[in-house]
Amino acid sequence: MDTADAIVEKLRAQCLARGAAGIQGLARFFRRLDRDGSRSLDAGELRQGLAKLGLALDEAEAQSVCRRWDRNGSGTLDLEEFLRALRPPMSQAREAVIAAAFAKLDRSGDGVVTLGDLRGVYSGRNHPKVRTGEWTEDEVLRRFLDNFDSSEKDGQVTLAEFQDYYSGLSASVDTDEEFVAMMSSAWQL
């Protein structure tokens, strides 16, 4: 195992120790480090971010990680590819059921789930806070969507964000059969 793989394994272990939301939390953390919105991190940003998580890298290690996930020769790591590598490996059955659940939510088929998509498959009408007048139905839908959304809370959930959410949960479910049954029941697939 080379340096970059060892670092990913350490980060993955930290995420799994945090439970089902660990990968999603780390994804949010790294996306916040991307201050310029380039969807990439340079070695300095990576070192700084990992240090905040208690994982110290020297310059050579940070460069190694950046080189591994540098998709365009810019010297920076592609954030989405790096986060994809951090997700615990999932079987094809798990990936397929997550994709099916996402597709059910993505009513418009444009690759993102929005409030408009949710209105067709999820009703907030009977939510206790709607019934008391505290929230509107749209507020319920937005808060539901925020569970899966990245830290920007842009009101859109991509398949990658949906996978981030479920990858941590997947790691805590022993068998594919249990995971598929859970997802099928939750999303009425």
Swiss-Prot record:
Question: Where is each EF-hand domain found?
Answer: 21-56, 57-92, 93-128, 136-172
Any one Gene Ontology molecular-function term assigned to this protein's record: calcium ion binding
**Major localisation:** cytoplasm
Residues annotated as binding Ca(2+) 2: 70, 72, 74, 76, 81
Q: Which residues carry this modification: Phosphoserine?
A: 38, 40, 74
Gene3D superfamilies, alphabetized:
EF-hand (1.10.238.10)
Residues binding Ca(2+) 1 are: 34, 36, 38, 40, 45
Q: Give the record's GO CC terms.
A: cytoplasm; vesicle
Sequence positions that bind Ca(2+) 3: 106, 108, 110, 117
Tissue specificity, please?
Answer: Abundant in the olfactory epithelium and the olfactory bulb. Low levels are seen in nasal respiratory epithelium, lung, kidney, cerebrum, cerebellum, brain stem, thyroid gland, heart and stomach.
- CDD domains registered for this protein in UniProt: EFh (cd00051)
Q: Domain of life, per the record?
A: Eukaryota
InterPro entries, from UniProt?
A: Ca-bind_SignalingProt, EF-hand-dom_pair, EF_Hand_1_Ca_BS, EF_hand_dom
Post-translationally, this protein is described as follows, namely: Phosphorylated in vitro by CaM-kinase II and CAPK.
Q: Where in the cell is it found?
A: Cytoplasm
Q: Which UniProt keywords apply?
A: Calcium, Cytoplasm, Metal-binding, Phosphoprotein, Repeat
Q: What binding partners and quaternary form does the record give?
A: Monomer. Does not form oligomers in the presence of calcium.
* Function description: Calcium-binding protein. May play a role in cellular signaling events (Potential).
Q: What is this protein called?
A: Calcyphosin
Q: Which organism is it from?
A: Oryctolagus cuniculus
- Organism ancestry: Eukaryota, Metazoa, Chordata, Craniata, Vertebrata
